[in-house]
């Protein structure tokens, strides 16, 4: 098989893995269409709020795992840093724009964390810690998600990850921030819903 076919197949696989709407499927098992409740976002946070903590944790774990698997397969199949970084980014895009849900997906936070864990484990854990600190200090999951995403990119630079990785992580953070643009508007207006608040 020509090398470019391998690259194309791996990227297509990364997109399709990212596209698997685990949050939607987990919520459906609980009898809920997550697209029609809460924020309407197909992500673990909305599953947690709309279905329950256990369902939210399962959705997060599966979204995280599919990102990690997409990157791991690229690392094992092609190797290097550039191509797996691209696969990580494609997996995030797959989650945000899944073919199975007419390209209306989630915001990419859990999938992004999973996708960059094999490439930059320390930076990813630092980003996740940043999310936890900000989210629990402010009770804004959206703010924690945005800060955590950008901190992953910053820490990847600071920890000396191979050059494509920090740039890909930063690109993913920009995409995640864009998907949170309505949350950002509400944060600025003081109307964003806090964690644990009633709908």
How would you label these PLM feature ranges?
Residues 9, 13, 72-73, 133-137, ...:
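Residue-level signal for alpha-helical transmembrane segments in multi-pass membrane proteins
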Residues 162-172, 183, 194:
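C-terminal binding/interaction regions
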């Amino acid at each position: 098989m020509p090398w470019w076919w391998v690259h194309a197949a791996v990227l297509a696989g990364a997109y399709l893995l990212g596209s698997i709407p685990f949050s939607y499927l987990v919520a459906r098992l609980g009898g809920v269409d997550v697209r029609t409740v809460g924020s309407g976002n197909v992500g673990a946070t909305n599953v947690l709020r709309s279905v329950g903590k256990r369902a939210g944790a399962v959705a997060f774990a599966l979204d995280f795992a599919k990102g990690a698997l997409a990157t791991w397969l690229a690392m094992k199949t092609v190797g290097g840093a550039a191509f797996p970084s691209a696969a990580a980014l494609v997996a995030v895009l797959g989650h945000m724009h899944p073919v199975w849900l007419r390209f209306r997906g989630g915001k990419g936070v859990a999938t992004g964390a999973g996708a960059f864990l094999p490439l930059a484990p320390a930076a990813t854990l630092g980003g996740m810690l940043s999310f936890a600190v900000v989210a629990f200090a402010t009770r804004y999951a959206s703010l924690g998600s945005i800060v955590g995403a950008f901190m992953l990119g910053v820490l990847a630079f600071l920890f000396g990850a191979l050059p494509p990785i920090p740039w890909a992580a930063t690109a993913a953070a920009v995409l995640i921030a864009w998907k949170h643009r309505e949350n950002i508007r509400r944060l600025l207006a003081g109307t964003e819903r806090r964690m644990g608040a009633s709908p």
